[in-house]
Amino acid sequence: MRVALGIEYDGRQYFGWQRQAEVDSVQAQLERALSKVANEPIRVHCAGRTDAGVHATGQVVHFETNAIRKDSAWTLGVNVNLPDDIAVRWVKIVDDEFHARFSATARRYRYMIYNYDFRPGILRSGVSHYRGNIDADIMHQAAQQFVGEHDFTSFRALHCQSKTPFRSVHEVNVTRQGMYICVDIKANAFLHHMVRNIVGTLLEIGLGNQRPEWIPQLLDLKDRSQAAPTAKPNGLYMVDVTYPERYELPKLALGPLFMLD
């Protein structure tokens, strides 16, 4: 039997999604909890691996099991065995052809910026703090140059393992709500550090250190060293994964919870 789960987590205590020897990860905690409920070893496959300190409200995973359980066992039962900063949001029995990663047609991330002179006390692990007068409108205008299929070599991590640097960005929106700025980006898939590198570049433009035409120049250069520093991890959320409608997966509010969808 193949089971799909919707997962959310606060990534600050973990060395990313992927299971690793000698360090804690979201995957390891989830597999441990699922194995207890199933009474057999469980290995999960995710829609997209997140880095250390990165959060998710819309991660999707699937796993194979011989255990026959009620849906409540895969939600409430698993949650009882998880740390407080990881939670199952929904469960769905899926066809054997479904794959959390390969069946996905798009992923969506939100990057939350707290733009104020002084650091935040509340939500400090869920936003990235940047001082200065950040122009969200010019960031939004500049961000439209990322839409479409491009070679994102200038916006991938130096050790990114993807075989191709090409990705198709479906939409990017930058909005401000008081002291909070949200960079919302959807694409068919993302390269390692791609969202944070895009945000770092948009911040340089929003702060007035660069002009919007810098973006097409960076895309043409295909040189990571020429772009802005990578934005901090703690403001980044994986908020949604898109699948064909035939799978009938649940759709919940994107989050993070303090955002209005």
Curated annotation (Swiss-Prot):
Question: Which molecular function GO terms apply here?
Answer: RNA binding; tRNA pseudouridine(38-40) synthase activity
* Reaction catalysis annotation: uridine(38/39/40) in tRNA = pseudouridine(38/39/40) in tRNA
Query: Keywords on this record?
Result: Isomerase, tRNA processing
Annotated GO biological process: tRNA pseudouridine synthesis
Q: Which Gene3D superfamilies match?
A: Pseudouridine synthase I, catalytic domain, C-terminal subdomain, Pseudouridine synthase I, catalytic domain, N-terminal subdomain
The record describes its quaternary structure and partners as: Homodimer.
**By its UniProt entry, which NCBIfam families does this protein fall under?**
hisT_truA
Q: Under which name does UniProt file this protein? A: tRNA pseudouridine synthase A
Source species, please?
A: Shewanella sediminis (strain HAW-EB3)
**Lineage in the entry?**
Bacteria, Pseudomonadati, Pseudomonadota, Gammaproteobacteria, Alteromonadales
